[in-house]
Each structure stands twice: as C-alpha cells, then as structure tokens.
Amino acid sequence: YGVVVTDDQNRISSFQEKPSVDEALSDTINTGIYIFEPEIFEHIPSGQSFDIGSDLFPKLAELGAPFYAIPMDFEWVDIGKVPDYWQAIRSVLMGDVRQVGIPGKEVLPGVYTGLNVAANWDKINVSGPVYVGGMTKIEDGATIIGPTMIGPSCHICEGAVIDNSIIFDYSRIGAGVQLVEKLVFGRYCVG
C-alpha cells in the first residue's frame, strides 16, 4: 500500500508508495479511491509513463497542493493476487472481516444461500461456513465442508466432496469428484 502522512486537517504532507514496514512514516494507507479536479492534468506530463502513486502523489505533496485524505472506518482487503482473493473469501466466510456479512439466507447454522438453490439439506452432508449462490443445484449425497463458496448457477452432483474450496459460477462438479482446497474458475466441468 501507499502510506500517507497527514496533519490534523487530514491534508497530506507526504506520500510513500509501498514502503517497507520499517520505512513507513505512518500507519495510514492509501487505498486507491481518488477524486480529482480537471487541473490535475497540469501535473501529469504527456507522452511518457507517469504513475499516480510513485510520481503524481509525491509531487502533489511536495508542491503543497490541496491534497487530502479521508479516514474511513472499514477494513481494506487487498485482492490483487489469486491467493489474496482466496484468503479474502475465506476471511469473510469465517466472519473475520469487519462490516462484511455473508449474503443470502441462513438455511442451516453457518450455511447461507442465494435465491432458488435446489438442495435437500437433509440429504446433503454440510458443515459451515458455506455460501451457495443462487440457482445452484446440489444433489443428494454431496458433501460440502467450509469454508467453501459455491457461485451461482452451479451443479454439484451426487457423491461430490467440496472441502475448503471456491467454485465460481456456472461450474459443474461431477459425481464422486473430490475437491480439497481447490479454486475452480467459472464455466468449468470437473469430472
């Protein structure tokens, strides 16, 4: 993350793009949500590479431009890489991300679904936390062990085991397939 140092009016006095923990001048991060006036283009040279975080923000701070931070009371989760995204979903399912709840209806303790999920929960082995997206079909005899997220419009066949995995939308997991700590991108058939 970029790190900002602000005064008591939240005016940014310095900006560091991705410093090490030891080099960071504060614990206030820049999360990448910006509102600029059109005059910002006066500070950006044309015809060359110019990075907002590495070039523009330090320049604005140096110039003493009216450059402000807005403190927000929420947890920012970086999902720039697949392992980060996977961990973010697990963290939400486990209830570890402030102010973010699992969407849908809780059909069993720790098991949430979107609309129109076709599942006979009495004949499915499931232990949460689990989220199942809308329009998904889960056949009798399937096993789902959390933390697991199954996207919308999926089909989980009889005897399939989904354990600590993420399955994106429109995926089909065949009979007897075992997925343990797997990520299945959307529109795939497994097994």
Regions picked out by a protein language model, each given a short descriptive name:
Residues E39, S46-G191:
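Left-handed beta-helix
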Residues Y1-Q48:
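Conserved core of the sugar-phosphate nucleotidyltransferase
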